[in-house]
């Protein structure tokens, strides 16, 4: 299987930093993800949303990188949400309990709305993990 180079683009929407993940999430993705996280959180956003719409394969190291982002978000009390996961990866995030620590939404609008709603109400994770926050 050919791998796609990982890129991560950061943009701000309504006070929420959106990290768009492009390509495969594996060990090679760590520098791009670290750089994106630093850029996204440098100005203390209300929340961070991870977009998986254009991501590809996610291996166990990629899952570990997401866990690292969750740990950093929790340590800095930054709510975090995700959207755009395929059904397969959404199930993996639920089985591994990543979904307990970040809401997984269907689209960007839901993720942004939930992040803002969660941030307004002081929810450190931005949701209770059920995706309906």
List PLM regions with ranges.
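STAS-typified acidic loop motif
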Residues: 2-35, 52-54
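Amphipathic alpha-helical interaction surfaces in cytosolic regulatory modules
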Residues: 25-102
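Exposed boundary/loop context
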Residues: 8, 16, 55, 61, ...
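Short acidic-hydrophobic, aromatic-tinged amphipathic segments that line or gate anion-handling sites
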Residues: 102-107, 111
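Non-catalytic signal-transmission and effector/linker regions of two-component phosphorelay proteins
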Residues: 1-12, 116-133
């Amino acid at each position: 299987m050919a791998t796609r180079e990982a890129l991560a683009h950061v943009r701000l929407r309504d006070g929420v930093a959106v990290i768009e993940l492009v390509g495969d999430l594996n060990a090679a993705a760590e520098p791009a993800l670290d750089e994106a996280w630093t850029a996204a959180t440098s100005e203390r956003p209300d929340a961070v949303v991870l977009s998986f719409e254009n991501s590809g394969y996610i291996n166990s190291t990629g899952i570990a990188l997401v866990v690292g982002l969750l740990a950093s978000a929790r340590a800095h009390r930054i709510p975090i949400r995700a959207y755009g996961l395929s059904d397969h990866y959404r199930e993996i995030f639920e089985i591994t309990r990543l979904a307990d620590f970040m809401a997984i939404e269907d689209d960007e609008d839901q993720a942004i709305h939930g992040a803002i709603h969660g941030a307004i109400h002081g929810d450190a994770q931005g949701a209770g993990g059920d995706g309906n926050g």
